[in-house]
From Swiss-Prot:
It comes from Azorhizobium caulinodans (strain ATCC 43989 / DSM 5975 / JCM 20966 / LMG 6465 / NBRC 14845 / NCIMB 13405 / ORS 571). This is Ubiquinone biosynthesis O-methyltransferase. It comes from the Bacteria. It catalyses: a 3-demethylubiquinol + S-adenosyl-L-methionine = a ubiquinol + S-adenosyl-L-homocysteine + H(+); a 3-(all-trans-polyprenyl)benzene-1,2-diol + S-adenosyl-L-methionine = a 2-methoxy-6-(all-trans-polyprenyl)phenol + S-adenosyl-L-homocysteine + H(+). Disulfide bonds: none annotated. The lineage of its organism: Bacteria, Pseudomonadati, Pseudomonadota, Alphaproteobacteria, Hyphomicrobiales. O-methyltransferase that catalyzes the 2 O-methylation steps in the ubiquinone biosynthetic pathway. CDD domains: AdoMet_MTases.
Length: 253
């Protein structure tokens, strides 16, 4: 896919993630923090979608029949397991190296995912439509959050849903997500995040509203040091999810 002139991508961010290459699927490599939170992300997304679309949570393929777009899919850590749950998955990423890794891993695993190298804007321009649009750990890396959400929102079906996860802009997030994660614990490469690009839940809700969505759910994701694992919580000071529905959506019945 060809990059558009008005793309919301930040070239420096694309280059940084493109350089990760095969490390995407190494649970002990540079993407270890993403592997740590991935089960929680998947569980949250699955639960939200099952409730919204009235699917059977006990099914081995609870997302069957749903067309889902994973924006900024990276190496496919989210797309691939969602496809295993029955979703008709499309993953898009502007970094060509990410798509090569994602497609190779999916092929080896025998999982069908439609990976595309390009931007959300290009998919929107092509008239693509989805039941679900996901932008997890993405908006803190784009050049224009408002434009990104508007273009992503164009692709959500009237009864669909958009899920965004990102980092709050607080003193706590600076201490934990940047100083702690990048400089002290070295969970992430230095420079992975910029605190000034973090966005508060209120700001994100406003941008979602401008894109034609109303917030239906807000949840935090925190690390439990006693259990050594991540979990969903009410605390949105650092990591959080915002779920949005088209403002004029109709009932699923």
């Amino acid at each position: 896919m060809r990059m558009t002139a008005n793309a919301t991508i930040d070239p420096s961010e694309v280059a940084r993630f493109d350089a990760l290459g095969a490390q995407w699927w190494d649970p002990k490599g540079k993407m270890a923090p993403l592997h740590a939170i991935n089960p929680v992300r998947l569980g949250f997304v699955r639960d939200v979608l099952v409730r919204h679309f009235g699917h059977d949570a006990r099914s081995l393929r609870p997302l069957k029949g749903l067309r889902i777009l994973d924006i900024g899919c990276g190496g496919g850590l989210l797309s691939e397991p969602l496809a295993r749950m029955g979703a008709d998955m499309v993953g898009v990423d502007p970094a060509p190296g990410n798509i090569v890794v994602a497609q190779s891993h999916a092929d080896e695993a025998g999982v069908r995912v439609d990976y595309r190298q390009g931007t959300a804007e290009e998919l929107a321009d092509a008239g693509e439509r989805f039941d679900v649009v996901l932008a997890l750990e993405v908006v803190e890396h784009v050049a224009d959050v408002g434009l990104f959400l508007r273009r992503a929102g164009e692709m959500v079906n009237p009864n669909g849903i958009m899920i965004v996860s990102t980092l709050n802009r607080t003193v706590k997030s600076f201490a934990l997500a940047i100083v702690g994660a990048e400089y002290v614990l070295r969970w992430l490469p230095r420079g992975t995040h910029r605190w000034d690009k973090f966005i508060t839940p209120a700001e994100l809700e406003a941008e979602m509203g401008a894109a034609g969505f109303e917030m239906s759910e807000l949840a935090g994701m925190v690390f439990d040091p006693l259990r050594g694992e991540w979990k969903i919580a009410a605390d949105t000071d650092v990591n959080y999810f915002l779920v949005g529905k088209p403002a004029f959506h109709t009932s699923e019945g």
